[in-house]
Amino acid sequence: MILISDSMRATGLCDGDYEFGGLHVAVKDSVARTDDGSLAGSTSTLFECVQCAVKFGIPEADAYMMASQTPAELMGIKAGKICEGYDCDLIVLNEDDTIHKVIINGRIYE
């Protein structure tokens, strides 16, 4: 099993009105909708999907693997695990599972 997010460009933005692909999208309480009320896509990050999976009872290590190594292997990408010869971007968590820092292409973001 893998975890995915169909997050759209409003992910991480404050509630408000946006235009994406020529469509007006209103984000309220982290829910994005078009003018006719249809969902415009998810505003959940993959990290939030992992946290949700854990809340539903999936072991934490399995949830992280479902969001990283498993999909990478299915797509034939050398990523998703810390191993020689693999691309490795990381999130470093605090004890309360909040993000402490992110490492992308060797660059540290705090």
Where in the sequence are the language-model features?
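Short, acidic, Ser/Thr-enriched surface-loop or helix-capping motifs
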Residues: 94, 103
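His/Asp/Glu-enriched, well-ordered alpha-helical/loop segment
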Residues: 1-86, 90-93
